[in-house]
């Protein structure tokens, strides 16, 4: 089972990907984690990625696809895997399909977690976390007992600098521009499924599992 999980920033992709990974026994593959692991391991493609990052260049699609190819060759991917946040562009989707086609493989399903922009802005801008223990909080959904103080360890709660409304709206605009062609691409292949990400997290997971079987 080879799954692509899509959704805008703050839609809860990472959380749902972890739960799916645990339930189905397939690894969650995020490009950031794979990139860091490849650089740390000093693999050929990892060294190319490191050189690009150190020179201030973008890590190319070719390098990212090389990292995904190496990672999906590992034994824990034999029964499948879940790609979290990749591909992000049509070129990446086409590159991924071409890479898999060389192995006589293909993506089985693409799930898009749909969330409306303004509720998502409220969801993201309300987030904070403890500087000391990392516990997460939210102004509306999980407020701390005392403002800006962690319930667990009494550490100070901080917000990410990029979790302000203007930055979030810009990130969402970029996401929609990049991924709109992807929706059509995967829909035309009959691979696209959609889940309402505005629901309670347990219900979102239930709907995801209903698709995955």
UniProtKB/Swiss-Prot annotation:
One of its GO terms (cellular component) is cytoplasm. Signal peptide: none annotated. Zn(2+) binds at residues 130, 133, 150, 153. HAMAP family: Adenylate_kinase_Adk. Keywords: ATP-binding, Cytoplasm, Kinase, Metal-binding, Nucleotide biosynthesis, Nucleotide-binding, Transferase, Zinc. Catalyzes the reversible transfer of the terminal phosphate group between ATP and AMP. Plays an important role in cellular energy homeostasis and in adenine nucleotide metabolism. It comes from Magnetococcus marinus (strain ATCC BAA-1437 / JCM 17883 / MC-1). InterPro entries: Adenyl_kin_sub, Adenylat/UMP-CMP_kin, Adenylat_kinase_CS, Adenylate_kinase_lid-dom, P-loop_NTPase. One of its GO terms (molecular function) is adenylate kinase activity. It holds the Pfam family ADK. This is Adenylate kinase. Pathway: Purine metabolism; AMP biosynthesis via salvage pathway; AMP from ADP: step 1/1. Gene3D superfamilies: P-loop containing nucleotide triphosphate hydrolases (3.40.50.300). Consists of three domains, a large central CORE domain and two small peripheral domains, NMPbind and LID, which undergo movements during catalysis. The LID domain closes over the site of phosphoryl transfer upon ATP binding. Assembling and dissambling the active center during each catalytic cycle provides an effective means to prevent ATP hydrolysis. Some bacteria have evolved a zinc-coordinating structure that stabilizes the LID domain. One of its GO terms (biological process) is AMP salvage. Belongs to the adenylate kinase family. ATP binds at residues 10-15, 127, 199. Monomer. Its EC number is 2.7.4.3. Residues 126-163 are annotated as: LID.
């Amino acid at each position: 089972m080879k799954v692509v999980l899509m959704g805008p920033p703050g839609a809860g992709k990472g959380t749902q990907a972890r739960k799916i990974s645990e339930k189905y026994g397939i690894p969650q593959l995020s490009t950031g984690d794979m990139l860091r692991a490849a650089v740390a391991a000093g693999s050929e493609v990892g060294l190319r990625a490191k050189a690009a990052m150190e020179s201030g260049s973008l890590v190319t699609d070719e390098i990212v696809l090389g990292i995904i190819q190496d990672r999906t060759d590992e034994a824990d991917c034999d029964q499948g895997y879940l790609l979290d946040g990749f591909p992000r562009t049509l070129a990446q989707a086409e590159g991924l399909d071409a890479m898999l086609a060389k192995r006589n493989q293909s993506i089985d399903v693409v799930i898009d977690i749909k969330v409306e922009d303004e509720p998502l802005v409220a969801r993201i801008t309300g987030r904070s976390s403890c500087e000391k223990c990392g516990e997460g909080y939210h102004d509306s959904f999980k407020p701390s007992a005392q403002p800006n103080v962690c319930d667990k360890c009494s550490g100070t709660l901080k917000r990410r600098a990029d979790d302000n409304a203007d930055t979030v709206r810009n990130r969402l605009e970029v996401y929609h521009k990049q991924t709109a062609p992807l929706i059509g691409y995967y829909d035309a292949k009959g691979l696209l499924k959609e889940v309402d990400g505005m629901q309670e997290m347990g219900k979102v997971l239930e709907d995801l599992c209903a698709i995955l079987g």
